[in-house]
Amino acid sequence: IADWLFSTENDANGQPKGIGLSLWRFNVGAGSAEQGDDSQIASPWMRAECFLQADGNYNWNKQQGQRNFLRLAKERGVNKFLAFLNSPPVYFTQNGLATNTGRGGTLNLKEEHYKNFARFLANVIKGVEKHDGIKFNYLCPFNEPDGHWNWIGPKQEGTPATNREIARAIRLISKEFVNNQIDTQILVNESSDYRCMFDTHMTNWERGYQIQSFFNPDSTATYLGDAPNVPRLMVGHSY
């Protein structure tokens, strides 16, 4: 399977061995797998382990399957890696879950854990590089936070977030990376729909107009154009 995904070589008949993906995404899990059925995520396949444990220590034996694919990708020439999150660790969330069950459209992160969230991400970036030899070129702390899809049903790990919440967290993550001499670039988010970048699509203004919000200096509450490690990039999924 790794050859099919990553290889840029040809076989004896001159046919490509694979599709030669140039970047591989790694899902930094929030701990729903450890919660089991209590996670309220029905399918075990949709749950994810977390490096951070309840006692505050890190278990670098977690997420072995995904980490193995990072190594397989690197061995086959992939040189760009992106880490992303669907949810903060369950120890930091408002409802103690990695899903948005029973909540509204704001970030599922307790007020007192914003800095801990940033520290967790710095530790993951450093830990994976130390233990697996994989340097993440990019980190995306928020996956589809505009949340035009149904955040009520616990299908998988995930949380919405307003632009103000994203900006607040990104500034703290940026500061943590600078303090730890981490040069991984921080992507503002991965939008669930391109239209959320320049308008509102099945959501409200608090989670829309993302380009304007994050990269126009007039958007003083959410502007990230001067934050270290934050490139002027917007990422989205077209589906």
Residue ranges of predicted features:
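Active-site-proximal beta-alpha loop/turn segments in soluble metabolic enzymes
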Residues: 102-110, 144-161, 191-200
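Acidic-enriched, low-complexity/disordered segments with a strong bias for Aspartate over Glutamate
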Residues: 3, 11, 37-38, 55, ...
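Active-site groove signature of glycoside hydrolases
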Residues: 81, 85-88, 125-155, 188-192, ...
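Noncatalytic carbohydrate-binding groove/subsite architecture in carbohydrate-active enzymes
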Residues: 126, 156-239
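N-terminal catalytic cores of secreted or lumenal carbohydrate-active enzymes
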Residues: 1-137, 156-167, 171, 175
